[in-house]
Amino acid sequence: MDLPKDKSDRTHQRINLNNSGTDRTNDLYLHIVQTFGCIETTATENATKLLMLGDVEVEISASSVSIEWTQKSMISQTIADSIVIMIIGLCASDKNVLSESELKERNHNVWKIQELQNLFREQFGDSFSIDEGIGKKENVKNGSVTIGKSKATIDFSTMKLIDCNSNPLKGRVESILSIGQKLTTPLC
């Protein structure tokens, strides 16, 4: 983890964890991974160090969490604030994060498909339907939007429009697919 050599423009915050018999470090780590997606991780015997966007460094130990980030970066400031909120939430509540095994088992593509289908349901209401097992791929869920004589077919596994007989509907469906892809992408 390479951080800038000049630390004069960096902010450092240390939060002591209230260890009332419960180790929250693993929960915090899982919360951060679930929220920010790709992060650089280095583990030592006493602590786990995380680096996000090459700027925000988080060191998690059994008794405290240290966060260091560049003051002038709004994105880094937002990430640091989010981590502080996670710590406060974890200290104040029971376990509300997926376990590590559940996190590994969770299929991100299934979640993305469900979120996209929900987005299409919100946009098109009863005009949207899910068609299961179309063609050779029986486990692939496709969807269709039918408005009058216009029909669009969407392949949710590839997040692409398969067929559409109306240019205005095609534009709207492609726009919603684009928005859906952005909404289901991790923050960093």
From Swiss-Prot:
Cell location: Nucleus
Keywords from the UniProt entry: mRNA processing, Nucleus
The keyword Nucleus belongs to this UniProt entry's keyword annotation: yes
Domain of life of the source: Eukaryota
Biological process, per Gene Ontology: mRNA processing; negative regulation of mRNA 3'-end processing; termination of RNA polymerase II transcription, poly(A)-coupled
InterPro entries listed in its UniProt record: CPSF73-100_C (IPR021718)
One cellular component term from this protein's GO annotations in UniProt: mRNA cleavage and polyadenylation specificity factor complex
UniProt keyword annotation of Nucleus present: yes
Single annotated GO MF: RNA binding
Subunit structure: Component of the cleavage and polyadenylation factor (CPF) complex, which is composed of at least PTI1, SYC1, SSU72, GLC7, MPE1, REF2, PFS2, PTA1, YSH1/BRR5, SWD2, CFT2/YDH1, YTH1, CFT1/YHH1, FIP1 and PAP1. Component of the APT complex, which is a subcomplex of CPF, and is composed of PTI1, SYC1, SSU72, GLC7, REF2, PTA1 and SWD2.
Biological role stated in the UniProt entry: Component of the cleavage and polyadenylation factor (CPF) complex, which plays a key role in polyadenylation-dependent pre-mRNA 3'-end formation and cooperates with cleavage factors including the CFIA complex and NAB4/CFIB. Component of the APT complex, which may be involved in polyadenylation-independent transcript 3'-end formation, including snoRNAs and snRNAs.
Additional detail: Present with 1430 molecules/cell in log phase SD medium.
Protein name per its UniProtKB record: Protein SYC1
